[in-house]
Swiss-Prot record:
Organism from which the protein derives: Limosilactobacillus fermentum (strain NBRC 3956 / LMG 18251) (Lactobacillus fermentum)
Membrane spanning stretches: none
Assigned EC number: 1.1.1.94
Protein name in the entry: Glycerol-3-phosphate dehydrogenase [NAD(P)+]
Functional summary from the UniProt entry: Catalyzes the reduction of the glycolytic intermediate dihydroxyacetone phosphate (DHAP) to sn-glycerol 3-phosphate (G3P), the key precursor for phospholipid synthesis.
Length: 337
């Protein structure tokens, strides 16, 4: 049994914490929200995120980060991208001088605005190497709702040090949650972040009344864009046909459980972005990631026409139907381009 600290009590963080408790580990789940902490501890409920799910009574929540991470062998961060640096900064102070250093894992899917950095890069900058044994990315097709009811799920643990990836594989794996290892952190993180862009587009197509052919085309050509950008930064092309690539893309771009798909659907129905964000009440990572990926592609001269079209819809108020027409009216080219 290991002590594991889980930082972030949203849908995914709380369900992963619950899984680890059921795997026999001592888990402390950290949240800033004391009311949420009290409800998790007293009623074993997290209604804002998983209203119908009852958590294992062995799961302990706290608003005290020091209590959560003290003595933890593994620290799992499941924080929205925009909050990663702040939480990592707090964590760095708490880990200063701690031995043995814990293994860090993150399950956040996004790119930092303005710097365009991946989450592992932010963590490496904020938390000194002496305060951590490694940084592992946990990613793949894994809706929290499915894991909560113990549907069969498979994900990837990616780390340049495969021994660290294998440690996380053993920590999380059970009869319904299977973890594979990979050493391609860049590919895993780009796949995890960029699929949210395509999920927005897929939802928008459904909202506009398009059917299976259109969604299949979007997902396939969207994967080509994800691969192009990832490879430009050193990712292994094979990663994008794995769980953290096409696997995560398919589940996020086809399921109504995906908040990015739902947000795109509302946009396709004619709602304004500000209203969609307010209605959702949760972070829609794909909106910010679209901007970051578009700007990154411009800087690296990577062709990402679907991403560019979504950028214009989200940030320049272009009509969605016009954006789709524009994509279809581009000069025809080879599928390999």
């Amino acid at each position: 049994m290991k002590k594991v600290a889980v930082l972030g009590a949203g849908s995914w963080g709380s369900v992963l914490a619950n899984l680890l408790v059921e795997n026999g580990h001592q888990v402390m789940l950290w949240s800033r929200n004391q009311a949420q902490v009290d409800q998790l501890n007293q009623e074993h409920k997290n209604p804002h995120y998983m209203k119908d799910f009852t958590y294992n009574e062995g799961l302990v929540a706290t608003s005290d980060m020091q209590a959560a991470v003290s003595g933890a062998a593994v620290i799992l961060m499941v924080i929205p991208t925009k909050g990663v640096r702040q939480v990592a900064g707090q964590l760095a102070e708490l880990l200063n001088g701690v031995t043995p250093a814990p293994l860090l894992v993150h399950a956040t899917k996004g790119l930092e605005q303005n710097t365009y950095k991946r989450v592992s890069e932010m963590l490496a900058e904020e938390i000194p190497a002496a305060s951590r044994r490694g940084i592992v990315v946990l990613s793949g097709p894994s809706h929290a709702e499915d894991v909560a009811i113990k549907d069969v799920t498979a994900v990837t643990a990616a780390c340049g040090d495969l021994a660290c990836a294998k440690e996380i594989q053993e920590l999380f794996s059970n009869h319904y949650f299977r973890v594979y290892t990979n050493d391609d952190v860049i590919g895993a993180e780009f796949g995890a972040a960029l699929k949210n862009i395509i999920a927005l587009g897929s939802g928008a197509l459904s909202g506009l009344g398009y059917h299976d052919n259109a969604r299949a085309a979007l997902i396939t050509r969207g994967l080509a864009e994800i691969r192009r950008l990832g490879v430009a930064f050193g990712a292994d092309p094979m990663t994008f046909i794995g769980l953290s690539g096409v696997g995560d893309l398919v589940v996020t771009a086809t399921s109504k459980n995906s908040r990015n798909w739902r947000a795109g659907y509302q946009l396709g129905q004619g709602q304004k972005l500000a209203d969609v964000v307010e209605n959702m009440g949760m972070v829609i990572e794909g909106v910010a990631t679209t901007k970051a990926a578009y700007e990154l592609a411009q800087k690296r001269h990577v062709q990402m026409p679907i991403t560019a079209a979504l950028y214009r819809v989200l940030y320049e108020d272009e009509d969605i139907k016009s954006a789709i027409d524009g994509l279809m009216e581009r000069e025809v080219t080879s599928e390999k381009e």
